[in-house]
């Protein structure tokens, strides 16, 4: 996924760094377009760190939002129990050294984290994925044992694909097959619960990956079984951005999400490094990092929204979370205070502490919070994970 992660030798800062993955960019800052009938965005890639790279879109129009009826949530089947915490704290663990510090063993990750996202798998070409464990994580045998120990405690440990400079081609039947088989081998070897899709490079309207990635993931789940964990962490431009302007990268993840609704465990877009956002609930852009932004975007994913003449049907509340930076060092923009995280969670689950925007109803099954990153949080003295976990424990 694009903005999310820095690679070896870089800080999760607005610094471009070569990595094992091919070209990546970061959709940061910049003026977010207002919805118009015929937008023509022109993304301008500008690498910046965060749970993924992102091209910086520069749409031409200066749209004016037109009020539209809020789609009513579509009833969805009851989720199958997964063993995942009802309200989860999800974080990315660095399989590389950067200014947050050297890689350290998974065994040293605080048990406050419910989902540990290993960052990242490598592009081995032709749709294949590989994984090389950083020496700082210990021997391969130790890494495997550490993953098993975390899972024995009820934690989920998954492999993320993408990152700030990450890309993998899944543009044909052959590449989809390689993607499935190589990841199944990795999951089996290391004991991962599943994967996280942080792939944005090459994801655009009409791109072959929109067709073949869902096929590959469905086949992977068929091999792994019903316990397969699938998360996605695209920048909001690729999802809710479709409301503003549906074309190019704007809303480009929507077809992938729609194709994988039955397989999806949780969608937690990145709400940092991308600027302010337009939603159906306000005439102007909502400030990045604010509680209103977190509530509004979660509301869009749960209650649905219009895009390109279509309607995005809401996901189950337990399939939705929000992604924020763990501190001011881990992202270039979009920092969220602990108070805003707490207010957003309480508003979404109990209709308490809401600001200007509130959901149509309380969603007590709202999944939780994703952050970039576990390593930066430890570097900063657990200033994010401890208070956020405390709030998550109080939710209904």
Summary of predicted features, one role per range:
Residues 1-36:
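Tryptophan-rich substrate-binding surfaces of secreted polymer-degrading and adhesive proteins
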Residues 16-18, 23-28, 44, 66, ...:
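Mixed-charge, low-complexity intrinsically disordered regions
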Residues 25-28, 387-395:
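Short, low-complexity, Pro/Ser/Thr/Gly-rich segments in the mature regions of secreted, periplasmic
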Residues 30-113, 121, 394-396:
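N-terminal module-boundary/linker segments of secreted carbohydrate-active enzymes
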Residues 81-301, 317-321, 326-343, 363-366, ...:
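Chitinase-like catalytic core of GlcNAc-active glycosidases
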Residues 298-312, 341-362:
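A short, acidic, amphipathic alpha-helical segment used as a generic capping/interface helix at domain edges
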Residues 373:
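Residues that scaffold, gate, or flank divalent-cation-dependent active/transport sites
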């Amino acid at each position: 996924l694009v903005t999310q992660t820095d690679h070896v030798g870089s800080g999760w800062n607005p610094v471009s760094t070569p990595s094992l993955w091919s070209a990546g960019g970061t959709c940061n800052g910049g003026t977010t377009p207002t919805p118009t009938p015929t937008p023509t965005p022109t993304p301008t890639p500008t690498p910046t760190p965060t749970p993924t790279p992102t091209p910086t879109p520069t749409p031409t129009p200066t749209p004016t939002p037109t009020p539209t009826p809020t789609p009513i949530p579509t009833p969805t089947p009851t989720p199958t129990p997964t063993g995942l915490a009802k309200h989860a704290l999800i974080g990315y663990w660095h399989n590389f050294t950067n200014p947050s510090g050297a890689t350290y063993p998974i065994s040293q990750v605080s048990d406050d984290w419910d989902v540990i996202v290993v960052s990242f798998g490598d592009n081995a070409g032709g749709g294949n994925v590989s994984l090389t464990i950083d020496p700082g994580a210990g021997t391969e045998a130790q890494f495997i044992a550490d993953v098993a120990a975390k899972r024995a405690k009820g934690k989920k440990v998954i492999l993320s694909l993408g990152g700030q400079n990450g890309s993998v081609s899944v543009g044909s039947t052959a590449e989809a097959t390689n993607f499935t088989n190589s990841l199944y081998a990795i999951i089996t070897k290391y004991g991962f619960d599943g994967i996280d899709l942080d792939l944005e490079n090459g994801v655009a309207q009409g791109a072959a990956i929109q067709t073949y990635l869902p096929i590959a993931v469905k086949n992977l789940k068929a091999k792994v079984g019903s316990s397969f964990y699938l998360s996605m962490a695209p920048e909001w431009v690729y999802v809710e951005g479709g409301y503003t302007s549906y074309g190019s990268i704007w809303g480009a993840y929507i077809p992938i999400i729609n194709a994988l609704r039955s397989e999806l465990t949780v969608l937690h877009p990145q709400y940092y490094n991308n600027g302010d956002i337009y939603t159906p609930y306000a005439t102007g852009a909502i400030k990045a990092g604010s509680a209103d932004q977190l509530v509004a975007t979660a509301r869009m994913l749960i209650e649905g929204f219009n895009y390109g003449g279509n309607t995005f049907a809401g996901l189950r509340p337990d399939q939705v979370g929000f992604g924020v930076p763990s501190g001011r060092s881990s992202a270039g923009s979009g920092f969220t205070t602990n108070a805003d995280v707490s207010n957003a969670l309480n508003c979404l689950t109990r209709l308490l502490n809401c600001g200007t925007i509130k959901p149509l109803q309380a969603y007590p099954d709202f999944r939780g919070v994703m952050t970039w990153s576990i390593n930066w949080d430890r570097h900063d003295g657990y200033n994010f994970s401890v208070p956020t976990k405390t709030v998550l424990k109080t939710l209904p």
